[in-house]
Design a protein with these regions (language model features):
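Cysteine-nucleophile active-site neighborhood
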Residues: 3-74
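Amide-donor transfer/coupling interface in amidating biosynthetic enzymes
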Residues: 69-191
Protein backbone atom coordinates (compact mmCIF):
# COMPACT_ATOMS: atom_id res chain seq x y z
CA UNK A 1 0.00 0.00 0.00
CA UNK A 2 1.28 3.47 -0.88
CA UNK A 3 -0.21 6.42 0.99
CA UNK A 4 0.69 9.85 -0.34
CA UNK A 5 0.94 13.22 1.28
CA UNK A 6 -1.50 16.04 1.89
CA UNK A 7 -0.88 19.72 2.72
CA UNK A 8 -2.10 19.41 6.31
CA UNK A 9 1.19 19.46 8.25
CA UNK A 10 0.00 22.48 10.24
CA UNK A 11 -2.84 20.46 11.82
CA UNK A 12 -2.51 18.10 14.75
CA UNK A 13 -3.03 14.59 13.41
CA UNK A 14 -6.27 14.10 15.34
CA UNK A 15 -7.64 17.31 13.73
CA UNK A 16 -7.29 15.92 10.19
CA UNK A 17 -10.79 14.97 8.97
CA UNK A 18 -9.76 11.52 7.85
CA UNK A 19 -7.44 10.65 10.75
CA UNK A 20 -9.57 7.78 12.04
CA UNK A 21 -9.81 6.33 8.53
CA UNK A 22 -6.05 6.70 8.09
CA UNK A 23 -5.40 4.81 11.33
CA UNK A 24 -7.86 2.07 10.35
CA UNK A 25 -6.35 1.69 6.88
CA UNK A 26 -2.78 1.52 8.20
CA UNK A 27 -3.79 -1.02 10.85
CA UNK A 28 -5.49 -3.19 8.22
CA UNK A 29 -2.53 -2.80 5.88
CA UNK A 30 -0.14 -3.88 8.64
CA UNK A 31 -2.14 -7.11 8.96
CA UNK A 32 -2.85 -7.76 5.27
CA UNK A 33 0.03 -6.27 3.25
CA UNK A 34 3.75 -6.91 3.07
CA UNK A 35 4.56 -3.22 3.57
CA UNK A 36 3.01 0.24 3.66
CA UNK A 37 4.93 3.15 2.14
CA UNK A 38 4.00 6.57 3.53
CA UNK A 39 5.16 9.59 1.53
CA UNK A 40 5.48 13.10 3.01
CA UNK A 41 2.48 13.72 5.34
CA UNK A 42 1.67 9.99 5.40
CA UNK A 43 5.28 9.38 6.50
CA UNK A 44 4.83 11.90 9.31
CA UNK A 45 1.56 10.23 10.30
CA UNK A 46 3.17 6.78 10.41
CA UNK A 47 6.04 8.22 12.48
CA UNK A 48 3.48 9.69 14.88
CA UNK A 49 1.86 6.28 15.27
CA UNK A 50 5.35 4.92 16.05
CA UNK A 51 5.80 7.56 18.77
CA UNK A 52 7.58 10.50 17.08
CA UNK A 53 5.64 13.73 16.54
CA UNK A 54 6.40 16.32 13.88
CA UNK A 55 7.72 19.83 14.42
CA UNK A 56 5.97 22.45 12.28
CA UNK A 57 8.31 24.88 10.49
CA UNK A 58 7.81 28.64 10.14
CA UNK A 59 8.66 28.41 6.44
CA UNK A 60 8.39 25.72 3.82
CA UNK A 61 11.28 23.34 3.24
CA UNK A 62 11.29 23.27 -0.54
CA UNK A 63 13.85 22.12 -3.05
CA UNK A 64 16.09 19.21 -3.96
CA UNK A 65 18.38 18.16 -1.12
CA UNK A 66 21.20 15.65 -0.63
CA UNK A 67 20.64 12.59 1.56
CA UNK A 68 23.10 10.03 2.87
CA UNK A 69 22.28 6.35 3.12
CA UNK A 70 22.69 5.17 6.71
CA UNK A 71 22.20 1.48 6.01
CA UNK A 72 23.94 0.39 2.79
CA UNK A 73 23.23 -3.30 3.50
CA UNK A 74 19.49 -2.75 3.90
CA UNK A 75 17.25 -4.34 1.21
CA UNK A 76 15.78 -0.95 0.26
CA UNK A 77 18.94 1.10 0.55
CA UNK A 78 21.58 -1.32 -0.72
CA UNK A 79 21.16 -0.30 -4.36
CA UNK A 80 21.08 3.45 -3.62
CA UNK A 81 24.22 5.52 -3.99
CA UNK A 82 25.86 6.39 -0.66
CA UNK A 83 24.66 9.92 -1.29
CA UNK A 84 21.64 10.81 -3.41
CA UNK A 85 19.19 13.67 -3.81
CA UNK A 86 15.45 13.96 -3.43
CA UNK A 87 12.81 16.70 -3.66
CA UNK A 88 11.34 17.98 -0.41
CA UNK A 89 8.18 20.07 -0.12
CA UNK A 90 6.94 20.32 3.44
CA UNK A 91 6.24 22.56 6.40
CA UNK A 92 7.36 20.04 9.03
CA UNK A 93 10.18 17.81 10.13
CA UNK A 94 11.00 15.25 12.80
CA UNK A 95 13.41 16.12 15.65
CA UNK A 96 16.73 14.32 15.20
CA UNK A 97 17.05 13.45 18.89
CA UNK A 98 13.57 11.92 19.04
CA UNK A 99 14.29 9.89 15.91
CA UNK A 100 17.58 8.63 17.36
CA UNK A 101 15.82 7.78 20.64
CA UNK A 102 13.12 5.87 18.72
CA UNK A 103 15.88 3.85 17.04
CA UNK A 104 17.56 3.13 20.40
CA UNK A 105 14.18 2.03 21.81
CA UNK A 106 13.75 -0.42 18.93
CA UNK A 107 10.83 1.41 17.29
CA UNK A 108 12.48 2.60 14.07
CA UNK A 109 15.34 1.84 11.68
CA UNK A 110 16.85 5.09 10.36
CA UNK A 111 17.77 4.67 6.68
CA UNK A 112 18.65 8.11 5.23
CA UNK A 113 19.60 11.51 6.60
CA UNK A 114 20.32 14.94 5.17
CA UNK A 115 21.93 17.76 7.13
CA UNK A 116 19.37 20.24 5.79
CA UNK A 117 16.33 17.94 5.98
CA UNK A 118 16.95 15.54 8.88
CA UNK A 119 15.97 11.89 8.91
CA UNK A 120 13.96 11.44 5.74
CA UNK A 121 13.72 7.69 5.12
CA UNK A 122 13.06 5.25 7.96
CA UNK A 123 10.95 2.22 8.80
CA UNK A 124 9.37 0.41 11.70
CA UNK A 125 11.54 -2.31 13.22
CA UNK A 126 9.28 -5.02 11.79
CA UNK A 127 9.74 -3.44 8.32
CA UNK A 128 5.96 -3.31 7.81
CA UNK A 129 5.91 0.48 7.41
CA UNK A 130 8.38 2.51 5.37
CA UNK A 131 8.34 6.29 5.71
CA UNK A 132 9.78 8.77 3.22
CA UNK A 133 9.25 12.43 4.14
CA UNK A 134 10.38 13.61 0.72
CA UNK A 135 8.80 13.42 -2.69
CA UNK A 136 10.76 10.94 -4.82
CA UNK A 137 7.69 10.70 -7.09
CA UNK A 138 7.94 14.37 -8.10
CA UNK A 139 8.80 15.37 -11.65
CA UNK A 140 10.37 18.65 -12.74
CA UNK A 141 6.92 19.75 -13.90
CA UNK A 142 5.43 19.06 -10.47
CA UNK A 143 8.06 21.25 -8.79
CA UNK A 144 7.44 24.04 -11.31
CA UNK A 145 3.71 23.72 -10.65
CA UNK A 146 4.36 24.17 -6.92
CA UNK A 147 6.60 27.17 -7.60
CA UNK A 148 3.81 28.83 -9.58
CA UNK A 149 1.19 27.98 -6.94
CA UNK A 150 3.42 29.28 -4.15
CA UNK A 151 4.13 32.55 -6.00
CA UNK A 152 0.43 33.33 -5.71
CA UNK A 153 0.65 32.89 -1.93
CA UNK A 154 3.70 35.13 -1.80
CA UNK A 155 5.04 33.76 1.48
CA UNK A 156 7.01 30.74 0.27
CA UNK A 157 10.70 30.96 -0.66
CA UNK A 158 11.82 29.60 -4.04
CA UNK A 159 13.10 26.01 -4.04
CA UNK A 160 16.69 25.38 -3.04
CA UNK A 161 19.10 23.48 -5.30
CA UNK A 162 16.67 23.49 -8.22
CA UNK A 163 17.16 25.18 -11.61
CA UNK A 164 13.79 26.10 -13.06
CA UNK A 165 15.37 26.33 -16.53
CA UNK A 166 16.66 22.75 -16.47
CA UNK A 167 14.63 19.68 -17.30
CA UNK A 168 17.11 17.49 -15.41
CA UNK A 169 15.40 15.11 -12.99
CA UNK A 170 18.60 14.44 -11.05
CA UNK A 171 16.76 12.35 -8.47
CA UNK A 172 15.35 9.87 -11.04
CA UNK A 173 17.72 7.04 -10.08
CA UNK A 174 16.79 7.41 -6.39
CA UNK A 175 13.09 7.35 -7.24
CA UNK A 176 13.35 4.36 -9.55
CA UNK A 177 15.56 2.34 -7.21
CA UNK A 178 13.42 3.13 -4.17
CA UNK A 179 10.18 1.99 -5.77
CA UNK A 180 11.83 -0.98 -7.52
CA UNK A 181 13.48 -2.21 -4.33
CA UNK A 182 10.33 -1.61 -2.25
CA UNK A 183 8.23 -3.64 -4.69
CA UNK A 184 10.87 -6.39 -4.71
CA UNK A 185 10.90 -6.35 -0.89
CA UNK A 186 7.08 -6.68 -0.85
CA UNK A 187 7.23 -9.53 -3.37
CA UNK A 188 9.80 -11.40 -1.28
CA UNK A 189 7.62 -11.10 1.83
CA UNK A 190 4.66 -12.82 0.18
CA UNK A 191 6.42 -15.40 -2.00
Amino acid sequence: VIITGAPVEHLAFEEVKYWDEFVNITNEARNLCASTLGLCWAGFALAYLAGVNKTVFDKKLFGVFPLKSLSPGHPLMGTQDDEFICPQSRFAGLPDLEMEEAQKEGKLNLLAYGKDVGYTIFETKDQKQLMHLGHPEYTVHRIISEINRDKEKGDVPPPENFDINSSNTSWRSHRNLLFQQWLWFCYQQVS
